[in-house]
């Protein structure tokens, strides 16, 4: 009787061990324990395999003062980068000014939109290349605001269509450097003549061939003194180049 009990107990233990081993084994020959879940490591990877790569600097603009270093209307002469063309949009865009001093981090050379009596946009166009803003392309800028004003990224595609991103940047406390990744944005079309948004929000647009890139302030300025305006100093765009 005792022998039968020992045999039965041994069979029970062996059966339990086999069941535990089967439970731990991956189904269908899958990855071993501790391996990343399917697709987990591939998030953000390029179509050809491997991690997505951050694009190099496409352009940098620091703006250029005149000989007097005073406040004056922005023109093509205000662009320090010889490879870039200045593009202004909005009925009052020519009311934007350049001010500030070179080498002064408390008052760097910058675009000031305080005199814009309506929405105003500033875009930059590379003479030789379109910008591919897909993937990990991003824009970095040094800005300061007054009141509730903020700037938003704006793009003009190769077909002439213009879009404004749904993210806004700006701090009223001090100059702040911030970045926006284009892949994170949703978009609204912009009427270039009025610098106002139109239509419904678009989740994704084709950013593989962008003609111009810049910023827009969708609120009118309040003039000199505290109230409502935007300051935009250095701008850096990180994107791949596409020949024109």
Predicted features along the sequence, with ranges:
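Juxtamembrane cytosolic interface motif at the C-terminal end of transmembrane helices
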Residues: 19-23
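Bacterial N-terminal signal peptides that target proteins for export
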Residues: 1-9
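Beta-rich carbohydrate-recognition modules and glycan-binding surfaces
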Residues: 24-244
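Bacterial N-terminal signal peptides
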Residues: 8-18
